[in-house]
Amino acid sequence: IHGGFDATPGTLKAKLNVRGNFLMDELARDLDIPFKRNGSLVVCTKDQDRSGLEKLLEKGTANGVPDLRIIEREELIAMEPNLSDDVTCALFAPTGGIVCPFHMTMAFAENACTNGVKFFLNTQVDTIEKNGDSYRISTLHTDTKNKETFEAKVVINAAGVYADVFNNMVSENKLHITARKGEYCLLDKDAGTHVSHTIFQLPSKMGKGVLVTPTVHGNLLVGPTAVDVDDKEAVNTTASGLDSLAATAARSV
């Protein structure tokens, strides 16, 4: 759960990031979601310019992120003894947190169902057509092959890497999404206490780096990579990807 220091001040994203972070404690209680406000650190190494952290601090302060500050190595190592020798300072966001994304997604779905939302699973959208002030959505059930048509005043396109397909059915502004695959390494619970905060790397010309974080279940999560791929369903992991994670993570821990 991001603190909100990276979003551009004045944008809707910045407003909702900080507001959403604030609401997480209540949401976790209401929906019984595993949630821990463990705080996050954006670490800066010897070969990086500290001004990058200062810019994030300025953005976070403008966005209203509470208790945001830069801490020096002595205090930092007291908080996280296993940080790399190259780490010199870090931006500390106490409001950062972690959840289980699977539990969270299911909790949202269960709550929606309780509130009357109907789910049409295994249902493929074939076409979306503008019909006056509404939309006509033609679907095919992938198991029974039954066809069904829906009318809707509003269609929310939440199709991920396939969002361009549905956008292009109705919009003159055609889109093409190039999928970007991220590989993670989930370590055993024996490694779960290696760090207690979510450790981000300061973005550089070489990319955003990888994070190292505990999970709410006690594991350690490292990642992701970021590789453009042609196959939108390429969810396989690779030896080269995992090697890259290990090498990049070593910059911070």
Please identify what each model-predicted range represents.
Residues I1, F22, E26, L31-R37, ...:
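Active-site substrate-recognition segment that forms the wall
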Residues H2-M79, T88, G209-V210:
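Dinucleotide-binding Rossmann-like beta1-alpha1 core, especially the glycine-rich loop
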Residues Q48-S51, M79-V87, E129-R136, G192:
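A short, glycine/Asx- and small/polar-enriched loop/turn
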Residues L91-V154:
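Helical element adjacent to the flavin cofactor pocket in flavoenzyme catalytic cores
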Residues L12-V18, V43-G52, L91-C113, F120, ...:
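Short beta-strand to alpha-helix junction loop
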Residues R69-E72, F119-L121, N157, V222:
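General beta-strand structural signal in soluble alpha/beta enzymes
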